[in-house]
């Protein structure tokens, strides 16, 4: 058993028979009253995000989660096939478990998969990935009714907003947490 003082990003808690992944946490020590821990947690199965506050020092049950590096091989219908790079075992992960990570995954890309009792819980991508723009309209510099961005389709099929100067076949860096454009990549 752990206490709320052990909470950090990535910790998986068992609460009311469900597994919850800590996305954000903040230890708060107010001037009056006892300390507490404010968290934002994602339900591992449903993906629902909730805010929950725990009193400091409260005993909590953590789940043992094994995080391993896997290589994304291919999509098989609604499922995704990954290979463990240490022993070359392949696992199949449902599309629901992969979630929004599909927007940023290319074949042969390395990802981190969290596994609990032999079941994949979620996919962890690097904070940013480099992807190619497959289609975007030409940007007209003087004709602006917005903040100077335009839609662009990535090689994964996901659409992001990019600055007007970005053209087709340009490699860009994309934030995997919110899908935002981070910059052009020069080879």
UniProtKB/Swiss-Prot annotation:
One of its GO terms (biological process) is peptide biosynthetic process. Its main location: cytoplasm. Keywords: Cytoplasm, Elongation factor, Protein biosynthesis. Pfam families: EFP, EFP_N, Elong-fact-P_C. One of its GO terms (cellular component) is cytoplasm. One of its GO terms (molecular function) is translation elongation factor activity. Belongs to the elongation factor P family. This is Elongation factor P. It comes from Pseudarthrobacter chlorophenolicus (strain ATCC 700700 / DSM 12829 / CIP 107037 / JCM 12360 / KCTC 9906 / NCIMB 13794 / A6).
């Amino acid at each position: 058993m752990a206490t709320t003082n052990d909470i950090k990003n990535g910790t998986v808690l068992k609460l009311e028979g469900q597994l919850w992944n800590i996305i954000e946490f903040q230890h708060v020590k107010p001037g009056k009253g006892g300390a507490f821990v404010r968290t934002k947690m994602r339900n591992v199965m449903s993906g629902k995000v909730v805010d929950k506050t725990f009193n400091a020092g409260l005993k909590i049950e953590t789940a043992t989660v094994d995080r391993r590096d896997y290589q994304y091989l291919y999509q098989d219908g609604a499922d995704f096939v990954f290979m463990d790079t240490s022993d070359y075992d392949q696992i199949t992960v449902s599309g629901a478990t992969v979630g929004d990570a599909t927007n940023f995954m290319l074949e042969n890309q390395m990802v981190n998969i969290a596994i609990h009792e032999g079941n994949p819980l979620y996919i962890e991508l690097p904070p940013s990935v480099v992807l190619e723009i497959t289609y975007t309209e030409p940007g007209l510099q003087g004709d602006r009714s917005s903040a100077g961005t335009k839609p662009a389709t990535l090689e994964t099929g996901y659409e992001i907003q990019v600055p007007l100067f970005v053209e087709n076949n340009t490699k860009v860096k994309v934030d995997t947490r919110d899908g935002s454009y981070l910059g052009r990549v020069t080879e």
